[in-house]
Amino acid sequence: MVHATSPLLLLLLLSLALVAPSLSARKCSLTGEWDNDLGSIMTIGAVNDNGEFDGTYITAVADNPGNITLSPLLGIQHKRASQPTFGFTVHWNFSESTSVFVGQCFVDRSGKEVLKTKWLQRLAVDDISDDWIATRVGNNDFTRQHTVEE
């Protein structure tokens, strides 16, 4: 019975050996346009040799939605990894608040790039006694709007 399954097993192992490098070789790139699960849109420019990047963010969620404007972001990523970790800060132009995001850029099994992030948003408050309510915490998943060729 071992001899009958050996060619099948060999074929399976050969297939895995050929497919596995292509899965791990796919590099996730931050550069491009992304949207998240809430409808916010982020554009990240080219990442320089130090891993630094800038871009813009337009949120779909705000306390005063009529005041939303495009806001700048600044960030940095680890360059060596094929699925790098990163962080960036958004300076909201329409409110007295700042957000920081940390996350990792993944390529899922279907080849789709996904940014998994956690964020903190600090709101300005008028009195130190309101400090306890001034920081919000959340998470967002971003998917690429357009494919980027490197």
Swiss-Prot record:
InterPro entries, alphabetized: Avidin, Avidin-like_CS, Avidin-like_sf, Avidin/str, Avidin/Streptavidin-rel
Lineage top rank: taxon: Eukaryota
Keyword Signal: yes
SUPFAM superfamilies the record matches: Avidin/streptavidin
UniProt feature coiled coil, ranges: none
Keywords, sorted A to Z: Biotin, Disulfide bond, Glycoprotein, Secreted, Signal
Modification after translation, per record: Glycosylated.
Cystine residue pairs: 28-105
Subcellular location as annotated: Secreted
UniProt GO molecular function: biotin binding
Carbohydrate attachment residues: 67, 93
Gene Ontology CC annotation, any one: extracellular region
Signal peptide extent: 1-24
Domain Avidin-like: 26-147
Positions bound to biotin: 36, 40, 57, 59, 63, 95, 99, 140
GO terms classed as biological process: biotin transport
Function: Forms a strong non-covalent specific complex with biotin.
Family of this protein: Belongs to the avidin/streptavidin family.
Quaternary assembly: Homotetramer.
Protein name listed in UniProt: Avidin-related protein 2
